[in-house]
Amino acid sequence: MATGPYDKSERVELADEAVHWDLGASLSYGEYLQLDKLLAAQRPLSSEHNEMLFIIVHQVSELWMRLMLHELTAALACVRQDDLGPALKMLARISRTQTQLITVWDVLSTMTPFEYSAFRSALGRSSGFQSLQYRLLEFLFGNKNADMVAVHQRDPQAYETLKRALESPSLYDEVLRLLSRRGYEIPADYLTRDFSQPYRASKQVAGAWLGVYHNADKGWDLYELAERLVDLDHNFQLWRAHHLKTVERIIGYKAGTGGTGGVSYLAKALELKFFPELWQIRTSM
């Protein structure tokens, strides 16, 4: 008798598979990932159903930022050592991770203003503005602001970690040093500047990047590095834009729980660029 698609077994047979049913002393999946701790970390402070969504979205974001910091720290070390191959791979991974951070806002956007207002008071003054990992990313990418360190004074370890990042060369600072080592003309004061201060765009740096693009065939790794940096900057701007629109959708123009102006504060960051010359030269290429 002929058989059709609905006559097939409704399950995958495991009889011929070498499944390890008895793990013995070996770690299980849950033990390796410490899922007991991870899944016990969602502790709503209200009885509202939607608070769980709010907590998980932010915890997932922090996990992705943890990975980004892991990759970015390693990429910085590689750039310092003129080892661009691994650095490019790490920066590409960061870019992919950023896309996950961006789509997280789509999940949070399923929450209505009414649903959020039902538990908002439970947050007190806590805010994403206080995220240590987010601020570290901003600093490592080059958006330095000493005022942001003060938010973490109550946690000495976090305060010192952020202070070190503030005073250390950012990814872009290290990339400019790399360009200098490769023979491109970078102003000397840019190589030894006070790294705790915000970066200021330079015509000479823009000229160096133009040289990288015009001589891509002789230094493809630098050309690819430039485009990787643009990817990161572009994705960060998309993340900020999605953040703003999600906040606007859920709370309108109310002040944020951290004391900022909410949407009006977030709007100020939309035009920030970590690597300004890489955007400026596009008009003249």
What are these regions (language model features)?
Residues 2-285:
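Surface-exposed peri-terminal alpha-helical interaction modules
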